[in-house]
Amino acid sequence: MESTLIVGADEFFGLSLCERMMDEGIHVDVVLAETEDKMRQMYLEERLMWLGRNELFRQLEHIGDQNYDTICIQFGSFLPLDQYDSPYILVYEEDRKEWDKREKTGSEKTVILPKMYGPWKEETEEDGYYTNDVADELLRFLLEPSRHSKDQLFELQVTEKTSKEEAKTKIIEWKRQFSSIFDKY
């Protein structure tokens, strides 16, 4: 895979996935949804300043005619599904019931993401996996030839690589680096 388009990369997981893909040398174009939430907007701007320094990253205002190896759309995003051939719809576990009710076009493939935690949501006993572990597994899935099967629904299986203690340390460090956002709220 050389290029991907991520629609709705304005969620914490979407940005983590961008970082993981760029680590592997994949060109990443993103389209962001508009947000009214001031904290979320500040977070996005700060994180995008960091991501934007990487030559593999590009933020698009409009989607042109460019071809991508993979298209990932975070559920709830604004892109009409019928415009693209076989996009992957990324659905958070907590949004699954809403996704199940929605009419499907038939060309999309759905990847159900497990519960996650990270700097935006401190982990508790019932919370799932550290966001970077999920991004690693999703990238591995997208790179596998088996993703081209006729199946339309995939439950992403994640193996915990980051212990709760390691994740806690990473979250503290992340918040320290982006303290200007977290200090204001």
From Swiss-Prot:
Question: Which top-rank group of organisms is this from?
Answer: Bacteria
Q: What is this protein called?
A: Uncharacterized protein YjaV
Q: What is the lineage of its organism?
A: Bacteria, Bacillati, Bacillota, Bacilli, Bacillales
Please state the gene responsible for encoding this protein. Answer: yjaV
